[in-house]
Amino acid sequence: MAIKDVKFGNDARVKMLKGVNILADAVKVTLGPKGRNVVLDKAYGAPTITKDGVSVAREIELEDKFENMGAQMVKEVASKANDVAGDGTTTATVLAQSIVSEGLRAVAAGMNPMDLKRGIDKAVAAVVEELKAISKPCETSKEIEQVGTISANSDETVGKLIAQAMEKVGKEGVITVEDGTGLDDALDVVEGMQFDRGYLSPYFINKPEAGTVELDNPYIILVDKKISNIREILPVLEAVAKAGKPLLIIAEDVEGEALATLVVNTMRGIVKVAAVKAPGFGDRRKAMLQDIAILTAGTVISEEIGMELEKATLEELGQAKRVVITKDNTTIIDGIGDEAQIKARVVQIRQQIEDSTSDYDKEKLQERVAKLAGGVAVIKVGAATEVAMKEKKDRVDDALHATRAAVEEGIVPGGGVALVRAANKVSATLTGDNEEQNVGIKLALRAMEAPLRQIVENSGEDASVVARDVKDGSGNFGYNATTEEYGDMLEMGILDPTKVTRSALQFAASIAGLMITTECMITDLPKEDKLDAQAAMGGMGGMGGMM
């Protein structure tokens, strides 16, 4: 078993705090509209330049094992805030540093750590409730744009792009961020349902200049099995040919004789047909086929429920205004499905999202909601160099998460004002069960000024003066670090998503509480120290032998 190094009490806490400060000091320089960049060296390629707090935190590993434990615990705060709200990582880190340093000072003065922690927890719970009370819904496109702009470090073009994307695909739509090819940002919107399966044979192509298959007002047959025998599909083909409409076949697979016959019929112009594989695998494929069925008012032909492909009729086929198939994707535009049924299906999938514990499953279910409810928007980030593109892509990603959080739980005044206001209101009435809990409450409420102070410091102004002026104000009154003016934060468009502020505070207080109540730290001895320890033990054994 490895030899361990153990530290107790104040020795352990001092080391831990040093690690916390190193990580937090590196992260907090990025906070606010005048926050600075951090350059991260990479093992290969150009360095990365970022203003994203969690990207900075993830890079930090310290040589001293005890200091590193402190740093890693604060890194967890940033990661958690990023996972839940997608933004607010720097705010969470600043709050954690402030609560930990104030808390450890109180512990060093002889206070009981457990009572301090209980006081901190009470203060945080009360402030979270107050944040919910002052939160207002984020509904207009202008508010969405403002949230996106603030989160992208005051880049208005990013805020506008995200607001446009949400307007086009709806608040439930999928918005993805990709590398662009030019200098300017671009927004591509895919309307209708798109899935990543292309045509099964290039002979189906009827628009050779674009290399695509386009079907106008087609029938759509959905089959939950492989089709290899043409006799199974023949009755449907004949019925569709009589109706004079094209046909799209979506099945687990179409192969052999069946595919060859479809290709021959298409090339001879007897019937206009195209075949694609069904999206997904296993149970997810069944669910997605059902989604397409509801969107196009069709029925999934499945042997599991006693249906036979040979007996399928035109009534069981779905329909859409248009279908476009490329080598890699199929897009169904304007399915004729019933609006009420589509909404009911969306509600059902949303319930599955709430019940799911897997991030991957949640993401896939969210994609299904978007395909049914709105569409897919792709923001293509443009920049002059790859380094600049990476930095901008990080900011767009943060802004996108922030706007989603704002739509979900509403918005509060930004610039650290919401926490100051909530803490002020709570301080008048909140008391603990004993004096040490009261100290915990006070230090937590004092720590909630830290994000405002850091934003002001990063803009080169006097943090104490600004913090006092903001505390003396009321409502949305705060400090705009961009223009260096005081005013109404909501009117100036400085907004934070409630979810981001709430998550940052809760995660920071949770980890800080654990660190304040730490009395002992254990780590492996570094290799050189291990060798010295083993040599010393060996030397003592030799001396015993001589005697």
Curated annotation (Swiss-Prot):
Coiled-coil portions: none
Protein's UniProt keywords contain Chaperone: yes
Annotated localization: Cytoplasm
GO BP annotations listed: protein refolding
Family annotation (SUPFAM superfamilies): GroEL apical domain-like (SSF52029), GroEL equatorial domain-like (SSF48592)
Gene3D superfamilies on file: GroEL, GroEL-like equatorial domain, TCP-1-like chaperonin intermediate domain
Reaction catalyzed: ATP + H2O + a folded polypeptide = ADP + phosphate + an unfolded polypeptide
Enzyme class: isomerase
Any GO molecular function: isomerase activity
Enzyme Commission code: 5.6.1.7
Family, as annotated: Belongs to the chaperonin (HSP60) family.
Subunit note: Forms a cylinder of 14 subunits composed of two heptameric rings stacked back-to-back. Interacts with the co-chaperonin GroES.
Function, as annotated: Together with its co-chaperonin GroES, plays an essential role in assisting protein folding. The GroEL-GroES system forms a nano-cage that allows encapsulation of the non-native substrate proteins and provides a physical environment optimized to promote and accelerate protein folding.
Alphabetized PANTHER family for the sequence: 60 KDA HEAT SHOCK PROTEIN, MITOCHONDRIAL
Protein name (record): Chaperonin GroEL
UniProt source species: Haemophilus ducreyi (strain 35000HP / ATCC 700724)
Gene name as annotated: groEL
